[in-house]
């Protein structure tokens, strides 16, 4: 896969990590970014994993709410074929599950 994919994916993962860390004032989340995998865990043990998948050029989300989803890079960010955005979906799910508001 191209360097461009890695740059976009890494930039997305780092920005998401930074945004969650900055907004988690009540320490509701355990957020880790290692080896191209962003792990977001709530105190109750529920986890979201966001990872780059080089062979397909996609970002993959594993969620306790929506299951496994694959997002393609588009002009609107990382999106599903139905138009849902990775940042929006992740923000909504984590906000709902944690009881706090997170914006990505």
Language model region names:
Residues 1-49, 53-104:
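N-terminal intrinsically disordered, cationic/polar leader segments
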């Amino acid at each position: 896969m191209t360097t461009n994919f890695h740059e976009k994916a890494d930039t997305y993962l780092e920005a998401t990590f930074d945004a969650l860390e900055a907004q988690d004032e009540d320490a509701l989340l355990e957020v880790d970014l290692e080896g191209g995998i962003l792990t977001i865990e709530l105190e109750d043990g529920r986890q979201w994993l966001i990872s780059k998948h080089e062979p397909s050029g996609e970002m993959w989300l594993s969620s306790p709410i929506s299951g496994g989803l694959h997002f393609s890079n588009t002009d609107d960010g990382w999106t599903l074929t139905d138009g849902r955005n990775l940042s929006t979906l992740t923000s909504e799910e984590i906000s709902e599950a944690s009881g706090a508001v997170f914006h990505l």
